[in-house]
């Protein structure tokens, strides 16, 4: 194996890990040669009401696309995360919660969490929520967010969690698509010392003329500050819970019954409702949580992701709780009020496993390692990274400053669509290279293909595809199976196209090189460029806009917008700021353009297609080798854009 920056598995980790290198190779081989037998065995890791006999029926043919796992079995996700732990672990901590203000602390045992979930499940039923209904959830990072998700799962309702940073328009589009009758929110969230007007955002979203489905809004009092109240529609969380019974028989769900919807940015504009089902998802989330993080009974596990993202679903709620872990939930941001907060929380709660994002690591790096002078960190055993590829220098900083060079780093690659981790080191099995996601998880068959779909062998670079299904895979785009086929299976026939490019080195390790489609990864969160462009063009002074990602020291990728103004509109710094605020209001703070360059014209082909590769290179300040511009209708546009670019390094 090439030794360039190779970090060997620590011997004490290898000796005690669930999986060592020899076992990984044996299990991986079995998982791809005999997936039926492999998953028949590992499907038993969760509790089934009616055991499955059929394991796998999947087709990646875009004309006959179907994905079914454990499909004649029945179960309930809430029972797997709660009830099955009660006999031995009712008094074990399920959730440790720390508020934005470190003085705010709460804990819930598995017994207490079970009671809360049963009560809220009954409360939902009292408001007419039935099996198969979509419930929209717009909550802060409080234990009640997990309660809501598990209560929905208990009664067979489908939760659709919307990230608390999204705008009213974004909420409205998700409510409309899911036809939600019930929305659950809080008066306000608290994050980084600021209050987030969650209820006000919901009110604005529901005032949208196309939102006609919502009958009830359940409001948790988080801050207690006064909020607008709609009589007959709005109900206080506390008043529902006062009268709700603590006993709730769980619905028996088919393995392929929907568990949740999570909307993700598409390159075509409208967000896609990614649908995950119950059986395969839970098997995969719990198995990857145990093996990728080498989770051991009694450990404290902290995933810093927001519940509004897939990482919060799979590795803050379902995976860890199915495994009976104690999870830490933090309401705020791990570098507030000072960058030392992350270390303080690790020490305060004796965290053993930390799962966070490169964007936070880079932000902490920028503050300097002396911020961690008072940090002990001796409880930490395993550290993970998620959301985007981590650059090697951030990896090394994380390893040295947070992990004290003792903790293996699992740099995990996966997507909303995959349900769980697909490519990652295993702590006791995989020597790591900073910046590489390394090897596939069990049952996952990655490949690289060229633009014609031909598989490329050996050390190479290409489009990353997956050749066969795995249990955690999404099943469809909600209400639009054709879009599911078109987005993921038509580009390269018979394969799942990830939308990412990757490089495979001579050791067979995978290095993710980033999106190859029109999606930007900002601080580990995906945004469709079409969404941002649509928001800009909706402004009265904008004639045309093109949006690309560019390298950003903190966020990984920043948003660079080229804007052509309407005739007669004057370019000004005031207008630039107005447009930034406009996008922020239309989509959310995450989508705010970092740089807006005025563009008299955009590079287009004669058929009118914008040539984004030129725009990406100019935004990245790579202006010496732009490639062939002969297909452009007006090549002179390029020179002007280079001349007026904003991201130049002097």
Swiss-Prot record:
The keyword Acetylation applies. The modification N6-acetyllysine is found at residue 609. ATP binds at residues 387-389, 411-416, 500, 515, 526. CDD domains: ACS (cd05966). Acetylated. Deacetylation by the SIR2-homolog deacetylase activates the enzyme. One of its GO terms (cellular component) is cytosol. This is Acetyl-coenzyme A synthetase. Its EC number is 6.2.1.1.
